[in-house]
């Protein structure tokens, strides 16, 4: 699995801590971490949590990433931004129980975490434990186990509702302020990382018009 890490500007200084915790947990599982930044608070490209949603949607819908880890001060804004787009089901994860139940009950493809609220002494340990529960035990297996059938059924119903209420991603992007879009893909390593992994030629061609 290719796991993308995205940080917005208010918590960009923690990017290295988050990346280290994520890699420590998931690389031994055989997953790959791709860090799209922000890498530091003074990066030239300043991502807002709204732009994290745009970038996450581009990565997931294009196949450039299979999963996205992101967040903001509380995680709430990033979660709302990601869930504004088709092809993205983002949970809000504060602790390992959130991580495990989201993986097995909701079976999404992104999480938003609080990187300021509650992030004190031992914060990196909480990240590691969350990532262990998020990626270490599979997905969509239900919790409690005896609830797996109705939970999987409800997940399929939700997927159907979302398919009916969202329009294709490129149509969504064309309706958004171009400057907001350009800022979302302005990261110093975006082009290098994205085009090497993108599996959707149409979306790749559209993204090139933003650069």
Regions found by a protein language model. Name each.
Residues 4-17, 100-210:
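C-terminal binding/interaction regions
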Residues 14-29:
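Short, solvent-exposed amphipathic alpha-helices that sit
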Residues 14-15, 53, 75-81:
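Short glycine/serine/threonine-rich phosphate/pyrophosphate-binding segments
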Residues 29-45:
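A short beta-strand-loop structural module common to alpha/beta enzyme folds
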Residues 49-67:
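Short, structured active-site "lid" loops
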Residues 65-71, 90:
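A short, small-residue-rich loop immediately preceding and capping a beta-strand
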Residues 77-90, 94-97:
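Short Gly/Thr/Asp-enriched flexible loops that form oxyanion-binding sites at enzyme active sites
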